[in-house]
From Swiss-Prot:
Taxonomic source organism: Dictyostelium discoideum (Social amoeba)
Keyword list, A-Z: Metal-binding, Mitochondrion, Oxidoreductase, Potassium, Transit peptide
Transit peptide is among the record's keywords: yes
PANTHER family from the UniProt entry: 2-OXOISOVALERATE DEHYDROGENASE SUBUNIT BETA, MITOCHONDRIAL, 2-OXOISOVALERATE DEHYDROGENASE SUBUNIT BETA-RELATED
Binding positions for thiamine diphosphate per the UniProt entry: Y130
Any Pfam family the entry gives: Transket_pyr
Compartments reported by the entry: Mitochondrion matrix
Subunit structure: Heterotetramer of 2 alpha and 2 beta chains.
Catalyzed reactions per annotation: N(6)-[(R)-lipoyl]-L-lysyl-[protein] + 3-methyl-2-oxobutanoate + H(+) = N(6)-[(R)-S(8)-2-methylpropanoyldihydrolipoyl]-L-lysyl-[protein] + CO2
EC number(s) reported in the record: 1.2.4.4
Stated name of the protein: 2-oxoisovalerate dehydrogenase subunit beta, mitochondrial
């Protein structure tokens, strides 16, 4: 197992690879996608930010407003491998922004203890692939703390941030999408933003949420997603999906970095085939917005759900089951899932593994002609 200086060298190489390929999973030229920005009411002054800067700004505001908020994790003191915590230690001091040992189980356990004692811990797991050593602490301790104490104690102020998903040359251990593991756990909330505006608003809502939250950040979007972000304090409600694009022929559902892939597929379907697609960004995986999805599917009668995680047991299966229960008589075609393969995440074959816009476009065509 890599530890200490060796793992720092590996992470440094991965980050440099990430910078060279960001915006295009195959490493080829990036095609800009005009992704619709979310409008925030009474937004006030705005500033151009990419996704990691919006997350940094969100944590900054949380720490300004809450003197009990602390940020910690591997290498967060110097800004983290993706720079999400840059400048926070200088501003708030080493007692509130600090490094931890390379021990994810310890990070999670320490965060649970802090939350139980009234602090507001914002813990970082450096890559979502390494959240598994902390799995027991998260699902058996954090998620059940309030329940098993009969409501006497809780660690609801806990937020665990972690970058997830494909990025280009990440390989087996820096590319995974583990959201469905945690979506299966009562007592946790699971949030995945797709834009800078949403990242900041959802993160602030997560930090102030009364249940523990796992906040997965699409590392592909850290620098490639750029918007005019309100610099003030605002929240986006958890558990509420966003209809990115309205349509009448087919419902397309995704989250995180997959949203830009889906928008590209939707645009292709409309330009080449005249298909009107309704595109939904779940934003919160647990609890997910059942009513928004059901209302859309009853209108369109056709559904494609896409995520990077393997198909079997992925969150698309849970959504599909609910749609089948709630919308059976409205369906005009079988529900389609466009997902990663049921294999470990490959290195050189990443381009073929990920559910790109072409795979989603073909699935839309297949569903429409059924």
């Amino acid at each position: 197992m890599l530890r200490g200086n060796n793992i720092k060298k590996v992470n440094s190489l991965l980050v440099r690879s990430f910078h060279s390929t960001v915006g295009n999973r195959s490493g080829g030229p990036s095609t800009p996608i005009n992704y619709p920005s979310l409008e925030i009411e009474n937004a006030g002054e705005k500033q151009k930010m990419n996704l990691f800067q919006a997350i940094n700004n969100g944590m900054d505001i949380a720490m300004q407003k809450d003197s009990k908020a602390v940020v910690f994790g591997e290498d967060v003191g110097f800004g983290g491998v993706f720079r999400c915590t840059v400048g926070l230690r200088d501003k708030y001091g080493a007692s509130r922004v600090f490094n931890t040992p390379l021990c994810e189980q310890g990070i999670a356990g320490f965060a649970i203890g802090l939350a139980a004692q009234g602090a507001t811990p914002i813990a970082e797991i450096q890559f979502a692939d390494y959240i598994f050593p902390a799995f027991d602490q998260i699902v058996n301790e954090a998620a059940k703390y309030r329940y098993r104490s009969g409501g006497q104690f809780d660690c609801g102020s806990l937020t665990i941030r972690s970058p997830y998903g494909a990025v280009g040359h990440g390989g087996h251990y820096h590319s995974q999408s583990p959201e469905s593991y945690f979506g299966h756990t009562p007592g946790l909330k699971v949030v995945i933003p797709s834009t800078p505006i949403e990242a900041k608003g959802l993160l602030l809502a997560s930090i102030r949420e009364k249940d523990p939250v796992i906040f997965f950040e699409p590392k592909l979007m850290y620098r490639s997603a750029v918007e005019e972000v309100p610099i003030g304090d605002y929240e986006i409600p958890l558990g509420k999906a966003r209809i990115v694009k309205e349509g009448k022929d087919i419902t397309i559902i995704g989250w995180g970095a997959q949203m830009r892939v889906l928008l590209q597929a939707v645009n292709m379907a409309e330009e080449k085939l005249g298909i009107s697609c309704e595109l939904i960004d779940l934003r919160t995986i647990q609890p997910w917005d059942v009513e928004t999805v059901v209302e859309s599917v009853k209108k369109t009668g056709r559904v494609v759900i896409s995520h990077e995680a393997p198909k079997t047991g992925g969150w698309a299966a849970e959504i599909s089951a609910t749609i089948q229960e709630r919308c059976f008589l409205h369906l005009e075609a079988p529900i389609q899932r466009v997902c990663g393969y049921d294999t470990p995440f490959p290195l050189i074959f990443e381009k073929f593994y990920v559910p790109d816009h072409l795979k989603n476009f073909e699935s839309i065509k297949k569903t429409m002609v059924y």
